[in-house]
Amino acid sequence: YSIAHQISRNENMLDLRIFGLYGPGEDYRYKFISNAIVKALLGLPITIAQNVVFDYLYIADFVRLVEKLLDCDWPYRHMNITPTKSIDLVSLAEIINEVTGNKAGITVLNPGWNTEYTGDNRKLLEVVGPFDFTSYREGIRELAVYYQSVWDSLDLDVVRADPFLDKCIVKR
């Protein structure tokens, strides 16, 4: 709260609220999209603790948005920096399996839906204007190509063991 208050009072500061970010450089051992891509490339099933809807923003879009924001006035000090289309984890896993050709399937461990983690990006689009967000399919395709290019540097044993899965919070 105190940081948000400081940002509100300082015209040189901007609070960009990120709801989900994916792309090269994130920790593939536990970040869902990257972890699922590496699992799919291994031919493993994609395991989801519980389905949930997210606003995942591709890193290249984040960079382009920040560049645009550096070149304009900010009528708002706090903005959600999210894509226009939200997506659930099962749908992401289906796209990942299609893009990678993985036939091992998708497992959801707990029924129901977890708490949605999305935001309204109307203020952002009001400031930067129309923006062409990378589709989830294209972002996943680019990320799969990236992981194939760094394959020998990945700790595949950790991906296979999936020690972070039990750290997921499940809504009962």
Show which residues each predicted segment covers:
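Active-site Tyr-X1-5-Lys
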Residues: 1-17, 40-41
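Glycine/proline-rich active-site loop of Rossmann-fold NAD(P)-dependent oxidoreductases
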Residues: 2, 22-34, 42-44, 59-60, ...
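Substrate-binding strand-loop-helix patch
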Residues: 24-30, 51-63, 79-98, 115-117, ...
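Generic structural signal for alpha-helix termini and adjacent loop/cap motifs
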Residues: 39-43, 69-73, 127, 146-150
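Hydrophobic aliphatic residues
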Residues: 40-41, 96, 100
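C-terminal "lid/loop" region of Rossmann-like NAD(P)-dependent oxidoreductases
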Residues: 51, 76-79, 90-93, 101-122, ...
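Amphipathic terminal alpha-helices
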Residues: 136-172
